[in-house]
UniProtKB/Swiss-Prot annotation:
GO terms for molecular function: ATP binding; ribose 1,5-bisphosphate phosphokinase activity. The lineage of its organism: Bacteria, Pseudomonadati, Pseudomonadota, Gammaproteobacteria, Enterobacterales. Catalyzes the phosphorylation of ribose 1,5-bisphosphate to 5-phospho-D-ribosyl alpha-1-diphosphate (PRPP). Pfam families: AAA_18. One of its GO terms (biological process) is organic phosphonate metabolic process. One of its GO terms (cellular component) is cytosol. Disulfide bonds: none annotated. The gene is phnN. It catalyses: alpha-D-ribose 1,5-bisphosphate + ATP = 5-phospho-alpha-D-ribose 1-diphosphate + ADP. This is Ribose 1,5-bisphosphate phosphokinase PhnN. It comes from the Bacteria. Pathway: Metabolic intermediate biosynthesis; 5-phospho-alpha-D-ribose 1-diphosphate biosynthesis; 5-phospho-alpha-D-ribose 1-diphosphate from D-ribose 5-phosphate (route II): step 3/3.
Length: 188
């Protein structure tokens, strides 16, 4: 059974870096889905498909999103194409939302594999400063939000990203292999 890997983590935890690295590795039945966002493509951050508010609303009205939500003054969507990819037996990883995990759980049930990317507060603060998108007040708010969102669903698989990217990639692939093995043992 193919899974929807719902990757979440605080802003600055390294989700975009991990997703970019996954796009560069040989796809072993794993696709990385782009999000549709009402944010300009050149705004920095993740590799996404930029839509106007009108385009987003049109797609939503025509059921072209498997999931969609609003956060940080933008609209976010996961295209309905992920359902086709899952039906074809491919695992799909998406940049999910901690606040909208329940919405994904309701739609995908046992096919949902939540993975929570975690970093220490010190590493998170350092990364937020290095990327230069937020001022100190905004960084303080992001750190506060990360701390408040640290209560994760019981089903969430934790993935530490304090170390080098290669280490996180290896841990991610190990986690997926273990989850696939556990699934087949339970299903037999």
């Amino acid at each position: 059974m193919a899974r929807l890997i719902w990757l979440t983590g605080a802003s600055g935890s390294g989700k975009d870096t991990l997703l970019d690295a996954l796009r560069q590795t040989e796809p072993v039945r794993l696709l990385v889905a782009h999000r549709y966002i009402t944010r300009p493509a050149q705004a920095g951050g993740e590799n996404h498909i930029a839509l106007s508010e009108a385009e987003f609303a049109y797609r939503r009205e025509h059921n072209l999103f498997a999931l969609h939500w609003q956060a940080h003054q933008y609209q976010y969507g996961i295209g309905i194409e992920v359902d086709h990819w899952l039906s074809a037996g491919l695992d799909v990883v998406v940049n999910g939302s901690r606040s909208h995990h329940q919405q994904a759980q309701q739609r995908y049930g046992s096919r949902l594999l939540p993975v929570c990317l975690q970093v220490s507060a010190a590493v998170l603060a350092q990364r937020l400063r290095q990327r230069g998108r937020e001022d100190e007040a905004q960084i303080a708010l992001r750190l506060q939000r990360a701390d408040a969102m640290d209560i994760l669903p019981a089903t969430c698989r934790r993935l530490n990203n304090d170390g080098p990217l290669a280490q996180t990639l290896q841990a991610f692939h190990t986690l997926l292999a273990a989850e696939k093995s556990d699934f087949w043992q339970i299903s037999l």
